[in-house]
């Protein structure tokens, strides 16, 4: 069982770039489809139900599933990172340095939230318009209620998994890590491992950011049709999508 588990772990880490690339293709398709859907909605609100239902299925396959895959990888990555800390390969300070080095969407949010000029505020809104305290709660108002395509210009960068990790550990720490991997008979090198760890944790957060944009827009579209039919938001749980 242990040998089988090691083999699965090795395969997951050594081939993660190809797997992550395929996951990202689904997320990119979802985001592009979201933008196209909003354009259709703005042009023709009457004959829209079929497109809406198709897109809701796409959210499952190209949003929720990719996020779940990244969440699973992030769980493995965090376990590995914790094992390095427990085995004194890295100390708590270095552990935090690795986590703080991640260019997650939260890093972008914090950077933009401090900026003041009109262009930067517009860029902030384009990225984070969809946020609401309860991601899946239709009753809670989001950052901006306007339903617009809001395309992301740097989508590839948000989903990038080629992290600059050479500076994170000292040569002594790298040597200790490679010895630890060899001792545990894992055919993985430091570069591949640390890139997998940082990419997995980063992309868990960034993939959720992508698919919740679609969730948020779907909720706003449902609210639009509910208002058209004088359906109260609190009553929406009693309706199927065909009834709205």
Where are these regions (language model features)?
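Contiguous hydrophobic, helix-prone segments at protein termini
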Residues: 1-244
């Amino acid at each position: 069982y242990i040998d089988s588990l090691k083999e699965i772990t090795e395969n997951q880490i050594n081939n993660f770039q190809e797997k992550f690339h395929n996951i990202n293709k689904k997320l990119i398709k979802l985001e592009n489809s979201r933008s196209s859907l909003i354009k259709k909605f703005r042009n023709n609100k009457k004959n829209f139900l079929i497109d809406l239902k198709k897109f809701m299925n796409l959210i499952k396959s190209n949003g929720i599933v990719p996020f779940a895959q990244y969440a699973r990888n992030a769980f493995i990555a965090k376990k590995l990172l914790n094992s390095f800390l427990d085995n004194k390969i890295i100390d708590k300070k270095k552990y935090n340095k690795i986590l703080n080095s991640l260019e997650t969407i939260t890093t972008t949010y914090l950077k933009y939230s401090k900026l003041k000029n009109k262009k930067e505020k517009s860029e902030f809104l384009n990225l984070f318009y969809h946020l609401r305290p309860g991601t899946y709660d239709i009753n809670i108002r989001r950052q901006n209620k306007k339903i617009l395509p809001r395309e992301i210009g740097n989508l590839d960068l948000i989903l990038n998994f080629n992290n600059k990790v050479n500076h994170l550990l000292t040569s002594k720490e790298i040597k200790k890590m490679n010895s630890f991997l060899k001792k545990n008979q894992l055919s993985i090198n430091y570069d591949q491992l640390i890139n997998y760890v940082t990419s997995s944790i980063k992309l868990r957060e960034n993939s959720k950011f992508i698919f919740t944009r679609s969730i948020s827009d779907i909720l706003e579209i449902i609210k639009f049709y509910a208002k058209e039919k004088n359906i109260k938001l609190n009553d929406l749980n009693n309706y199927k999508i065909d009834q709205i």
